[in-house]
């Protein structure tokens, strides 16, 4: 039961509607229990039953290939099957928690899930505007696909951050001064993106 709760928590953090959260809690019900769509309709609502059924259909899809040239077609197929965008959102949260617990899988299964995640689910999350989930998916997949490369990039990033920290601070201070001089009140934040994972996905 911990997996559905974790998926629901991920979606709650995204401030999604109640029906989506309930769907997250029930998303494995049709697949893993004897409960049917009709029973979910009776116990909850037709809306939630449709969403759970949609997630089940996506889960049952066989992603036999994640070659880059075919990944876009797979993403389009997922979007076409999911008549309600919330089905995709639940599936993305489901995949995120699967990746967070991926160490429990056999090595070959880890590689399969990581490739699917990098080629299909992470770009799909970006397309849906869920950038934080996209970055988390990319990072978790990158750990599996190229653990040593990821560690090397992080090490280099830390060095560059130390070397350029003063320069970055001066730039942000100058920007802040210019904004204040123009009568604009603003807060400047630095955002570090997962470009390493983006690069890996095109290798």
Regions of interest found by a model, annotated:
Residues 192-203:
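Single conserved hydrophobic/aromatic residue that forms the stacking wall/gate
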Residues 1-191:
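Active-site helical microenvironments for divalent-metal-assisted chemistry
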């Amino acid at each position: 039961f911990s997996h559905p709760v974790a998926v629901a928590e991920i979606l709650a953090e995204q401030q999604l509607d109640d029906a989506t959260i309930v769907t997250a809690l029930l998303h494995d019900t049709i697949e893993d229990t004897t409960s049917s769509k009709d029973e979910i309709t009776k116990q909850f609502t037709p809306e939630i039953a449709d969403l759970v059924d949609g997630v089940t259909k996506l889960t049952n899809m066989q992603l036999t290939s994640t070659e880059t040239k075919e990944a876009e077609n797979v993403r389009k197929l997922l979007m076409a099957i999911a008549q309600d965008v919330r089905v995709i959102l639940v599936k993305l949260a489901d995949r995120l928690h699967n990746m967070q617990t991926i160490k429990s899988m056999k090595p070959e299964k880890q590689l399969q899930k990581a490739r699917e995640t990098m080629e299909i689910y992470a770009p799909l999350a970006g397309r849906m505007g869920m950038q934080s989930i996209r970055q988390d998916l990319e990072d978790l997949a990158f750990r599996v696909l190229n653990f040593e490369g990821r560690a090397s990039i992080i090490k280099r990033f830390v060095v560059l951050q130390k070397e350029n920290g003063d320069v970055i601070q001066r730039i942000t201070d100058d920007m802040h001064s210019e904004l204040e001089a123009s009568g604009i009140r603003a807060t400047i934040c630095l955002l570090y993106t997962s470009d390493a994972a983006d690069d890996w996905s095109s290798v």
